[in-house]
Amino acid sequence: IHGLLSTMREAGLIEQNANGRYWLGIRLFEYGCAVSNAWDISAIARPYMQELSDALGESVFLSVLDRAAVVTLAEVESRASLRVVSEIGARLPIHCTSQGKLFLAFGTQAEARRILTRGVLEAHTPRTLTSYEAFLPELAKIRTQGYAVEQEE
């Protein structure tokens, strides 16, 4: 590991302070900006997200799956006074968000089982589903209706 950390430090990917602690280097920020400028998927998706938000009267999110979490890339907020909002870049648990439930329902069953049985599914509210078995009927319902709903989970 020491060799890898040294290589990353030399490349500017990480920094190290006098106490030996590491943190992300400026080079990673530069790479992120370059990728963001070259491939702004949120700009491509935004007109479609706006159209969907206008049609449904709800907030619309563009998210990606990252292991057992979803990361919000873009958002179009509903005009309703009571609406769901999310911070861009926020990492949310896959098992208690509508975005995560969609990934689980429309991905492979093997992947859903792997994610939902890998560790403890933390209950964020009394309504949070916390077992693979509890998820099966919910995922079947989502596949049938074509959308997912988060209900105070």
Please report, for each region that a protein language model flagged, where it lies by residue:
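Basic amphipathic alpha-helical segments that dock to polyanions
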Residues: 5-9, 142
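Beta-hairpin "wing" of winged helix-turn-helix
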Residues: 8-19, 23
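Cytosolic regulatory regions built on CNB/CRP/Popeye-like sensor folds
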Residues: 10, 110-113, 130
